[in-house]
Amino acid sequence: MPSFDIQSELNKHEVSNAVDQANREVATRFDFKGSGATYKYEGNSITLQAETDFQLKQMIDILQNKFAKRQIDVAHMRLEDPIIQHKSAQQTVMLLEGIDQTAAKKIIKLIKDQKLKVQAAIQGEKVRVTGKKRDDLQSVIGLLKEQEIGLPLQFDNFRD
């Protein structure tokens, strides 16, 4: 039976490259000279440090531009609240990866509401969709691309 997987993965190497490029741009920009503004990439988060809230907003914009240039979907980013102290400001950007249970259930409900002859099952952080006809699977992919789920989705392991 034909099947495919729905997932939301993040290319860590590209994220690291985007953060390095953003650090280089902040180091060379005139409005950031001497401010000590930096990005720190650790695991599933990026920590932004600057002197003011305004600089943090500029740094987020720079990071989003670098993500876009590296073909990383900006929807992977979730901004935490900034921590602003006397002469420093800090903000954490969480990187979302994988499909959580609530999003997986929402995806399965969307598929079942279409009454197509396919089955969808949650497998860890992926959703596997199987069906008898390849056309049904392609219509599921089209449906999910149109819907607003809140996660960037990738479709892979398409097997006949």
Curated annotation (Swiss-Prot):
CDD domains: YajQ_like. Keywords: Nucleotide-binding. GO terms for molecular function: nucleotide binding. It comes from the Bacteria. Signal peptide: none annotated. GO terms for cellular component: cytosol. Pfam families: DUF520. InterPro entries: DUF520 (IPR007551), UPF0234-like_C (IPR035571), UPF0234_N (IPR035570), YajQ-like_sf (IPR036183). The keyword rRNA processing does not apply. NCBIfam families: PRK05412.1 (NF003819). Nucleotide-binding protein. Belongs to the YajQ family. This is Nucleotide-binding protein CbuK_1936.
